[in-house]
């Protein structure tokens, strides 16, 4: 199977967001995105409690309050782009801090590039498609205002270029490119079309004007899912199927955060990592999962795009942690919870900033406090006390009382990173984690 560019490149040691942009995004989300927020009931583990994480199932729960907020969002967006006759400053009122013109809600044409199909029912593209659907609902857009380009191989520059050309030809003035390997072509098109807004998912390139990148603090949810796994395991061997090895900070940081969560509740447990060297390889993901289970792992987690670790776990009578979307639908007898993205939070905020002239060209790196990431409902398969411990640590993260990568951290080769009283900065987390936590072991599986 051909490897995509996501396989070949790693994050450089650069900061993926600036604080001004992050703070502006945060304020928008708090005031305008109640319509995409949802309370999850952690019904398993003996207690019914509410944990304030997000659902990525479209636009979330429709309540009277969320509908009111949604209508206010639509009204604000429409009001933001005023007719010149209503403002003495004329066109200047419609120019945002990045020096670009705002786009009226009804004039938006949004293009999206997917590595998979918009009809996928789980996984990476599915999560992004739910986010786009949520954005459309939240802003009251029409379906014909969205152009989807599906199954675009991010290792095929010609295919990426063709998809972008088609979006431009169809009149798209906002484009989201959702996979790592789309980065270079997105940059080139942003330079060629300076009046079009481009946002690239993951990656690191941007120009501070019409080309930005977006990702999130998924490690926060990884940490919480480690608590779930650490309490569940009976063998004290927990498997982790990872797309990339230690040269990719996104994967390695997620593994480390997960392993720290495991250790918090079960210091005797080990996390065994099998690396597939591909983001999307169903056969390898299946084989790696089977190998980890054969080595005694009774809980699997994953940073790969398919449900293979979940299906392998269900077939073998073991348990698993899903990723990207709620995978319990496919494997209800195995999936304990899933680490998910609520991309509608980001997409809604971004497009709204384009409409209301507050877009400033900054990159985005949100987390739980922005309702970008979270966990799905904990299954009744979870151990007693899981929901209480997850909620406790989630609240500490949200209140700023705890950061995952705090203080001196011991790696699995006995060295240490970090400093007492300090937290690893964003540049290190996104581009500089090339070490594994002390309870992690990378294993051979083929």
Which positions does each model-derived feature cover?
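Short, Lys/Arg-enriched N-terminal segments with co-localized hydrophobic residues
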Residues: 3-24
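Hydrophobic helical h-region of N-terminal Sec-dependent signal peptides
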Residues: 34-38
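C-terminal motif of bacterial Sec signal peptides marking the signal peptidase cleavage site
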Residues: 41-44
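A residue-level marker of the well-folded mature domains of exported/periplasmic proteins
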Residues: 48, 52-71, 75-446
């Amino acid at each position: 199977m051909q490897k995509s560019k996501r396989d070949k490149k790693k994050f450089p040691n650069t900061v993926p967001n600036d604080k001004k942009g992050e703070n502006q995004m945060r304020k928008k989300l708090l005031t305008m995105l109640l319509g995409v927020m949802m309370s999850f009931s952690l019904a398993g583990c003996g207690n019914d409690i509410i944990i304030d994480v997000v659902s990525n199932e479209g636009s979330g729960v429709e309540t009277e309050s969320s509908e009111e907020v949604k209508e206010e969002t639509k009204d604000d967006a429409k009001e933001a782009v005023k007719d010149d006759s209503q403002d003495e400053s004329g066109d200047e009122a419609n120019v945002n801090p990045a020096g670009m013109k705002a786009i009226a809600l009804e004039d938006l044409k949004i293009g999206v590039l997917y590595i998979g199909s918009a009809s996928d029912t789980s996984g990476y593209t599915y999560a992004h498609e739910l986010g786009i659907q949520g954005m459309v609902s939240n802003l009251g857009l029409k379906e014909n205002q969205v152009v989807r380009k599906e199954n675009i191989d991010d290792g095929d520059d010609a295919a990426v270029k063709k998809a972008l050309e088609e979006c431009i030809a169809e009149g798209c003035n906002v484009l989201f490119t959702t996979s790592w390997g789309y980065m270079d072509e997105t940059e080139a098109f942003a330079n060629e079309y300076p009046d079009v807004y481009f946002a690239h998912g993951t990656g690191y390139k941007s120009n501070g004007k019409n080309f930005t990148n977006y990702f999130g603090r998924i490690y926060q949810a990884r940490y919480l899912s480690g608590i779930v796994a650490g309490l569940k395991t009976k063998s004290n061997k927990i498997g982790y199927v990872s797309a990339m090895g230690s040269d990719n900070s996104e994967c390695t940081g997620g593994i480390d955060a997960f392993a720290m969560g495991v250790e918090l509740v079960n210091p005797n447990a080990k996390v065994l990592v099998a690396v597939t060297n591909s983001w999307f390889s169903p056969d390898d993901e299946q084989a790696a999962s089977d190998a980890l289970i054969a080595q005694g792992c009774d809980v699997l987690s994953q940073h790969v795009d398919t449900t293979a670790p979940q299906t392998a776990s269900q077939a073998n009578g073991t348990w698993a942690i899903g990723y990207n979307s709620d995978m319990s639908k496919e494997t209800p007898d195995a999936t304990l919870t899933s680490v998910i993205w609520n991309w509608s939070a980001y997409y809604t905020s971004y497009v709204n900033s384009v409409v209301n002239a507050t877009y400033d060209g900054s990159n985005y790196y949100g987390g739980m406090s922005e309702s970008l990431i979270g966990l799905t409902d904990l299954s009744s398969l979870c151990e007693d006390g899981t929901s209480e411990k997850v909620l406790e640590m989630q609240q500490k993260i949200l209140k700023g009382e705890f950061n995952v990568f705090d203080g001196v951290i011991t790696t699995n080769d006995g060295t240490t990173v970090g400093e007492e009283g300090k937290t690893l900065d964003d540049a290190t987390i996104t581009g500089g984690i090339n070490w594994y936590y002390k309870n992690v072991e990378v294993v051979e599986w083929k």
